[in-house]
């Protein structure tokens, strides 16, 4: 009205609307300018998903999914903000300017600096002469819905730019772009407080609400803007083990090199395969299922000698048993006697063994049955070698 008091109007933020355009441009740029092969690949984006009545290409599928989740987040943020405003019912700082109460009709003197007058609670429905819609909006201040929507929009967009785009050559491009996206939301909060439309606590609560919803959707719903791995049945532990990379053993390579050509193709399998359920004893334990990487029974590889450690003593070879001499009727001229050549038969038997220690060992084991040695074994422990010989 001319010459009258200016009318207050409700303000709306259009920042959330620009996010649709930003995500659309980002997906189009990603479709026409794909990432180089050296970049981290995205699983499952090369498959065209076909539904009951239509087919979705990977760029269209990503665009619909990201924008759909963003729209769902906008509705969720609006519901949370409206619920908080209705429950709390805190008035805005400019509530009296919007309400325009008629103090004369209400029987209340208008407040003045000289005479503030007593406080009085007014519950009359017609106490406000302003626009009913503006009055209803001025009664709901906490949390600030505009701040919540702006915070949600810029947080979603900043995370999209950070997680999707790959920029080479400079590390400040993405941080600068994210800060440029966060500035409008901050300015909206400052304007709401400067124009006395909201308190600073209302704006802060709106920022926290919008940022929390955006972070939850990006992290748990769209999985950081990456595609899910192809869904399927859960692999068993044995199938998971069979798909794991294997490492060839040097002993297996040596066995393959020593095997004939006909058996070499079966000796070393490419990967471990689950065998039939059986009971296997391994270090004193029973294992119900065993995974074997051995070759078939038709092809056997030679054993590779185990390298001996330096600390292990080398076993001495056992002497071969000597045949028992044939019983003789008398002293033969070829066998030496007790005093030299031509001696008794017992002296000839003693010369068959080189040392007294081996002679007594054979006597104990029964391989050299001689009455002379059985009788003289006990004195050997206490006598010298010259005395026994």
Curated annotation (Swiss-Prot):
The modification Phosphoserine is found at residues 236, 249. It is found in: Membrane. SMART domains: acidPPc. Glycans are attached at residue 102. One of its GO terms (biological process) is phospholipid metabolic process. The keyword Ribosomal protein does not apply. One of its GO terms (cellular component) is plasma membrane. Residues 265-278 have a biased composition (Polar residues). It is a multi-pass membrane protein. The chain crosses the membrane at residues 14-34, 66-86, 147-167, 176-196, 203-223. Its main location: membrane. Keywords: Glycoprotein, Membrane, Phosphoprotein, Transmembrane, Transmembrane helix. GO terms for molecular function: phosphatidate phosphatase activity. Belongs to the PA-phosphatase related phosphoesterase family. This is Phospholipid phosphatase-related protein type 2. It comes from Bos taurus.
């Amino acid at each position: 009205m001319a010459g009258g008091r200016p009318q207050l109007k409700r303000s709306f933020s259009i920042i959330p609307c620009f996010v649709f355009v930003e995500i659309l441009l980002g997906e189009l740029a990603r479709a026409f300018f794909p990432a180089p092969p050296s970049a981290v690949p995205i699983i499952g984006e090369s498959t065209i998903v076909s539904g009951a009545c239509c087919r979705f290409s990977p760029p269209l599928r990503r665009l619909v999914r990201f924008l759909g989740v963003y729209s769902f987040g906008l509705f969720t943020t609006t519901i949370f903000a409206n619920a908080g405003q209705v429950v709390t019912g805190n008035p805005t700082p400019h509530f009296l300017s919007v309400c325009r109460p008629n103090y004369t009709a209400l029987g209340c003197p208008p407040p003045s600096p000289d005479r503030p007058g007593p406080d009085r609670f007014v519950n009359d429905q017609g106490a406000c002469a302003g626009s009913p819609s503006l009055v209803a909006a001025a009664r709901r201040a906490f949390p600030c819905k505009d701040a919540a929507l702006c915070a949600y929009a810029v947080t979603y967009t900043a995370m999209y730019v950070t997680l999707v785009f790959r920029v080479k050559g400079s590390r400040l491009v993405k941080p600068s772009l994210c800060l440029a996206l966060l500035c409008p939301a901050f300015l909206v909060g400052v304007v709401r407080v400067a124009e006395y439309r909201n308190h600073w606590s209302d704006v802060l609560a709106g920022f926290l609400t919008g940022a929390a919803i955006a972070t939850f959707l990006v992290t748990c719903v769209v999985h950081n803007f990456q595609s899910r791995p192809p869904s399927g049945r859960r692999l068993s532990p044995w199938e998971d083990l069979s798909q794991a990379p294997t490492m060839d053993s040097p002993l297996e390579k040596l066995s393959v090199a020593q095997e004939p050509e006909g058996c070499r193709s079966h000796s070393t399998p490419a990967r471990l395969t689950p065998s039939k359920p059986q009971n296997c004893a391994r270090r004193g334990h029973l294992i119900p299922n065993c995974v074997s990487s051995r070759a078939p029974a038709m092809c056997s590889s030679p054993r590779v000698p185990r390298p001996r450690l330096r600390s292990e003593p080398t076993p001495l070879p056992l002497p071969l048993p000597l045949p028992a001499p044939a019983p003789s009727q008398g002293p033969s001229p070829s066998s030496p006697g007790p005093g030299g050549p031509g001696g008794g038969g017992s002296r000839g038997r003693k010369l068959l063994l080189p040392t007294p220690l081996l002679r007594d060992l054979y006597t104990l084991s029964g391989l050299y049955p001689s009455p002379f040695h059985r009788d003289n074994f006990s004195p050997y422990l206490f006598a010298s070698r010259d005395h026994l010989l």
